[in-house]
Regions:
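Cofactor-binding beta-sheet edge motifs in enzyme active sites
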Residues: 1-190
Length: 190
């Protein structure tokens, strides 16, 4: 958006990595990126991001509700496309990818060690914020099988596109650019 272009079109115009283009196009198509960009809803935004890690590629499209007055950020839905070469076990790979998304939402929106006067305030798990079932949005995962490639890393790659996609969606919703994790709700109404 800072470049004066649609975020998807900007990336597609500048990406030379065919595998990244493929996951980005797959996620955007299933998410309905172009249609959603046309119909704007107040206090809602969409964002996308893509990346590569350990020989795998991933793209995520996200919808959020972000309210500046209350500082509330809620992820409403995530569509990710993931390609890690030849898929050996599709059911396990999908479970791994979706587990990565849920784990990453914690670090994106909630998880942090809090300090005051050099002391840890949330030294117990009971005081450490992690996602609850109610925090988990609808997740759609598209697996792109590439039997022509060797199997590559599937452990953490699905995590890398979620935080920037959520941050981009928050910016789309309320024009506030959050650049550090967790995305702090207080920053929305500062």
């Amino acid at each position: 958006q800072a470049a004066g272009a649609d975020p998807l079109e900007f990336r597609l115009a500048h990406l030379s990595n065919e595998r990244l283009r493929n996951v980005l196009e797959a996620a955007a198509a299933r998410f309905g990126w172009r249609e959603r960009r046309k119909r704007r809803v107040a206090a809602r935004g969409i964002g996308l991001a893509c990346g590569t890690e350990k020989g795998s590629v991933v793209a995520a499209c996200v919808e959020v509700a972000a309210d500046r007055a209350s500082g509330r950020i809620q992820v409403l839905g995530i569509c990710q496309a993931f390609e890690c070469g030849a898929i050996q076990n599709p059911a396990n790979l999908k479970a791994q990818a979706e587990g990565c998304v849920i784990m990453t939402l914690g670090g994106t929106l909630k998880e942090e060690i809090r300090f005051e006067n050099g002391r840890i305030l949330n030294a117990r798990f009971s005081r450490y914020p992690v996602p609850r079932f109610a925090d988990v949005p609808a997740i759609e995962t598209i697996l792109l099988n590439r039997p022509d490639l060797a199997s590559a890393g599937a452990g953490e790659t699905p995590m890398i596109a979620v935080p920037p996609a959520v941050a981009n969606a928050v910016f789309d919703a309320c024009a506030v650019r959050l650049r550090s994790l967790p995305l702090r709700a207080e920053a929305l109404n500062a």
